[in-house]
UniProtKB/Swiss-Prot annotation:
This is Undecaprenyl-diphosphatase. It comes from Myxococcus xanthus (strain DK1622). Keywords: Antibiotic resistance, Cell inner membrane, Cell membrane, Cell shape, Cell wall biogenesis/degradation, Hydrolase, Membrane, Peptidoglycan synthesis, Transmembrane, Transmembrane helix. It is a multi-pass membrane protein. It is found in: Cell inner membrane. Bacitracin is thought to be involved in the inhibition of peptidoglycan synthesis by sequestering undecaprenyl diphosphate, thereby reducing the pool of lipid carrier available. It catalyses: di-trans,octa-cis-undecaprenyl diphosphate + H2O = di-trans,octa-cis-undecaprenyl phosphate + phosphate + H(+). GO terms for biological process: cell wall organization; peptidoglycan biosynthetic process; regulation of cell shape; response to antibiotic. The chain crosses the membrane at residues 39-59, 85-105, 113-133, 151-171, 190-210, 220-240, 249-269.
């Protein structure tokens, strides 16, 4: 992988990770446009660490407050005594569905699910769901109104992000809106909920990628991750400002347009569903089945 590829993919990752348009879809499509090989789910998961760092720094005050409240509540035997403590628990509980689904269904969400047909379908279907939710939601509740049911349900929405093209931010934002949360509150919770799953996925895939016989250079990983961090910070700030005064309709239109364009290109033979995708084999086991996994979108 060249440095130009690393920069472009890092930029794509950072800008699309937090927008409800699917980072995996764009990381899969971008190489097709430039004639590059698919970087793979492992590389995508590793440079997600850059966007995780962006969330940690952007929301550092909120995160410190949540962590402090969590342990203070345990020490005082009042684990759910404050809003911050409850939100910390909601994030932990909300991470369980994607973890369980990822481990249980990993054989079904490996390389085959990176097909451009799957991605185009996910882009369109989830866009239509977001449209319906946007129109019917009350947009009145805040994070202070969240209950255990809300944390679990949004966590289940996050599990849908295992399907490439669904978009982790898109599914969790849709889940939050469906429960009546204000757009900005739904987005803030989506960002906080992303931290455990994407961190664990990135660390796991980094270990796997470093052990693989064929892998990007360390420089490509560093550059991609740093660019993802910088562009991710910008994307977070922009999205929160945007959702204070606007709806998610622009993302719905974009997703449908991109999904339809992909289908047209696939049907006309301009694109191949699995072109450029390479499997990563287990080190020391020639011919072993691929272990590349899509953890979160």
């Amino acid at each position: 992988m060249s440095l130009l590829e690393a920069i472009v993919l890092g930029l794509v990752q950072g800008l699309t990770e937090f927008l409800p348009i699917s980072s995996t879809a764009h990381l899969r499509i971008a190489p097709e446009l430039f004639g590059w090989r698919d970087p793979g789910a492992a590389y995508s998961a590793v440079i997600q660490l850059g966007t995780v760092a962006a969330v940690l720094i952007y929301f550092r005050k909120d995160i410190v407050s949540l962590v402090a409240a969590f342990f203070r509540g345990l020490a005082r035997r009042e684990p759910f005594g404050t809003l911050e403590a409850r939100l910390a628990w909601f994030v932990l509980v909300g991470t369980l569905p994607v973890g369980i689904a990822g481990l249980t269904l990993k054989k079904f969400i490996e390389n085959e699910f990176r097909s451009l047909y799957v991605i185009s379908g996910s882009l369109i279907v989830l866009a239509l769901i977001l449209l319906v939710v946007e129109k019917r939601a009350s947009h009145q509740r805040t994070l202070a109104d969240m209950r255990w049911k809300d944390g679990i349900l949004i966590g289940m929405w996050q599990a849908l992000a295992l399907i490439p093209g669904a978009s982790r931010s898109g599914t969790t934002l849709t889940g939050g809106l469906s429960l009546g949360l204000k757009r900005e509150d739904a987005a803030r919770y989506s960002f906080l909920l992303s931290i455990p799953a994407t961190t664990l996925a990135g660390v796991f895939e980094l270990k796997h990628l470093l052990e693989a016989e064929t892998r990007p250079s360390a420089m490509a990983l560093w550059v991609g991750t740093l660019v993802a961090f910088a562009s991710g910070m910008a994307a977070i700030a922009w999205l929160l400002r945007f959702l204070r005064t606007r709806t998610t309709l622009v993302f719905v239109v974009y997703r449908v347009a991109l999904g339809v364009l992909l289908l047209v290109l696939l049907q006309t033979g301009k694109l191949s569903p699995m072109s450029g995708v390479e499997n990563v084999e287990v080190p020391g086991e020639p011919g072993a089945p691929p272990v590349e996994k899509q953890i979160t979108d």
